[in-house]
Amino acid sequence: MAEAAEKYSDLLHLKKAFATLATLMPDGSPQVTPVWFDYQNGVLRVNTAKGRTKARNMAPGAPVAVAIVDPDNPYRYVQVRGRVARVAEQGADVHIDQLAKKYLGQDKYPYAQPGEVRMMVEIEPKSITGMG
């Protein structure tokens, strides 16, 4: 797993690649959403607002999969499969601001809605594979 994480380090750390996050609905059907992400200390982190479908699907222990396609070469990608390790409101506003810096070049997340509660979701990889 560490070898794949190293091989695709540019996608996990440097590029402004969106991740496609797959979660499971209560009936077992897949739900797929493009998301911003970061990867730190072997943990993939995404951010969402409380009440959204993907947030409801990502309780601790829930299985998830993420595909990250290289924006410079669509035939190259990394896939992370794992489980939700942690969901936290604390630190989620800071995290979404960090992601806004990465993806938009802005210090503050500009799309916050009044009363919105952010959630940071940490995904513990069980496998990391890729192509290209």
Predicted regions and their residues:
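A short beta-turn/loop motif at secondary-structure boundaries
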Residues: 27-29, 70-74, 113-115
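Charged, gly/pro-rich active-site loop segments
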Residues: 2-3, 76-132
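Extreme N-terminal tail/first-helix region
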Residues: 1-18
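Short secondary-structure boundary segments
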Residues: 49, 70-71, 125-126
